Amino acid sequence: MLDESPMRKGDSVSNDQSNPESNASVSIHQQNQIITCVSPGPVCPNAIEIKRDIVIVRLRPVESCPGYRFFRRVFETLEKWQLQVDMFSTSLGRITLALGAAALQAGISDSCSARNDMMSRDLMHGMQKLLPDDHIELFPHMAIISVVGHPSRRMAGHIFATMDANDIPTVMISHDAARLGIACAISEQYTAKALCVFEQCLFRYSLTH
């Protein structure tokens, strides 16, 4: 389910004849923005979900710490601070986490900005006991957009091509082995645009072509 409905007033769909690959894309004019849809996806997804108030944490181990010990210390810190992990990835010994603000202790302000700022301070305090400052990167004010659909090898490529065509940068990607769900971490400022793009390109355009 979508957690917000983009404006639909004055929508129009037209083939881009000036594009030599016009058979592979269309431009959807919606109010003051143009949405580019690549060719219809293999299967229309079932739902799109957005989760806001996310902080991305990138951790780089010190050279003297073995990978297995670094992993253990990271998860011990997460358990101690009772932080919910929404996404997790590793690359060359580095760890990237997407943490939800819902794991914070009670009494946090209702302000979205205040929640993220408080989480950043609390998290930094916990991580500083684990790593030097220059080994920790925090990216607050992020969101996770998840696309749930039927299994298809082409679904991931179609989604990322759609995001790239509409200049929606991703910070983190998760794709389950069953190919039923794809999740991307994006900046909160892109959530409304991403929902609008996905509704137009993954639902409407796929269903009508």
Swiss-Prot record:
GO molecular function: aspartate kinase activity
Polar residues composition bias: residue spans: 12-27
Factors inducing expression: Expression is induced in loline alkaloid-producing cultures as well as in planta.
Biased composition (Basic and acidic residues): 1-11
Single GO biological process annotation from the record: lysine biosynthetic process via diaminopimelate
Location of region: Disordered: 1-27
Pathway(s) this gene product operates in, as recorded in its UniProt entry: Alkaloid biosynthesis
Cellular component annotations (GO), alphabetically ordered: cytosol
Keyword vocabulary terms for this entry: Alkaloid metabolism
Uses in biotechnology: Loline alkaloids show broad-spectrum anti-insect activity, and different lolines may have different biological activities. In vitro tests of NFL, NAL, NML, and semisynthetic loline derivatives with long carbon-chain acylations on the 1-amine have shown that many are effective against both fall armyworm larvae and European corn borer larvae, but the effects seem to differ depending on the modifications. N-Formylloline reduces the weight gain of fall armyworms by deterring feeding, and does not significantly affect corn borers.
Function: Aspartokinase-like protein; part of the gene cluster that mediates the biosynthesis of loline alkaloids, potent insecticidal agents composed of a pyrrolizidine ring system and an uncommon ether bridge linking carbons 2 and 7. Lolines are structurally differentiated by the various modifications of the L-amino group and include norloline, loline, N-methylloline, N-acetylloline, N-acetylnorloline, and N-formylloline.
Family the entry assigns: Belongs to the aspartokinase family.
Protein name, entry field: Aspartate kinase-like protein lolA1
Species in which this protein is naturally found: Epichloe uncinata
